[in-house]
Amino acid sequence: MSVRIINGKVYKNGVFSEEELVLKEGKIVSAQDGDAEEVYDAKGNYVVPGFIDVHTHGGAGVDVNAADQQGFEKIGHFFATQGTTSWLSSILTDTKEQTLKTIKEAVKHQEAQKNGHENCADLLGIHLEGPFLSPEYKGAMPEHLLISPDLDLLKEYQEAAGGNIRYITVSPEVKGVPESIKGMIDLGMKVAIGHSGADYETAWKCINEGAVSATHTFNAMKLLHQHFPAIMGAVLESDIYCEAICD
């Protein structure tokens, strides 16, 4: 199906200007006038790509860790109304039994999406926030469930997910984390560092091993000090992505 969007403010060459767009099967095929089966008047609105939320624990009153299929549907529909068209399901550190249950529910929802989910954000995969995190900066994580890296456990989770665990948050100072990052990458996961009071050198070691992002930068993280740059200094000095809690 083709759609022509008219009168919207489109971001082009560094500025927003009123342009027309023609989309076919969800992809932009023209930034000029063109014929289409459907015309949408975006007057007074900005036209931007859908947002991709790589770290979210739910929405519309539904917690991912406790979500069933109806819950995942509710989250996806809510996100779509807010301009988020794709997302990762972030699983808080939980028991092995509950983590596997949540993984299976997420995978089931992904499979159901293949049959079409109108007005529902696309679930791209899973983000594991833990369990290889520092107790000192645990935030909302249950401390008794935080452990040192266990690649066999992670492999079991990834197999249950059918390879759909895309992203994992770890704390650099937890014993064994820097040495385990390449193993996590080999399992098909992007690695983020966070929930951490790591020193500058340890954080950089993780970045050099392949960590590509910082989880909710500034939050649950030791902040910059003139004599102790810590993880914050390494994150800001490097070229890794920085998540932000924007409220």
Q: What are these model-predicted stretches?
A:
Residues 4-5, 22, 47, 53, ...:
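Conserved beta-strand segments that form the floor/walls of ligand-binding pockets within enzyme
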Residues 8, 26, 44, 55, ...:
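Divalent metal-coordination and catalytic microenvironments
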